Amino acid sequence: NTTFYVLQSGFSGSAAEHFLLEVKMSGRGKLYGETSAGANHFGYGVDLPNGFSTFIPVGRTFDPKTNWDWEGKGVAPDVSVPAADALLAVLKDVGVGADDAAKLNAQVGFTMPQRRPGGGPVVVRAPAPG
C-alpha cells in the first residue's frame, strides 16, 4: 500500500470530484490544494421562449456512507494550500528539500490562461515549454 497525492483546485469539478471523494473516503491518498468546485449535479439545459433558458437536473451524486452531497460546497483537501503551492506542499511533506522542490516545481509548473464563464482571465498550471 502506497499513499498517493492528488493536487486539486477550485477548477476541479464534476467527475474529478467523484475521484477526490473516493480518494478521501478510502484513505488511500491525500488531497492538497483548494476546495473543489462543488459541481456534482448533472442534467441538461433547455432553451425557452423569449430568450430564457433553464437547467433540468436529472441526477445527483453523494457519499453513500453519509448521504453528503457536495454540490455548491466542494470537496475539501486534506492539506489546504493555494493551488499554485500544492505541488510544493506535497514535495515538502514527502521530504524533498526546499531547493529541489522549487526546481521540480519549475520543471513541471506551468501557466495557461483560461477564462471563467463571464469573468476575467485565470491562471492555471500547464506543462512548461521544453
Task: Label each residue range with its predicted role.
Residues 1-130:
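C-terminal "post-core" interaction segments
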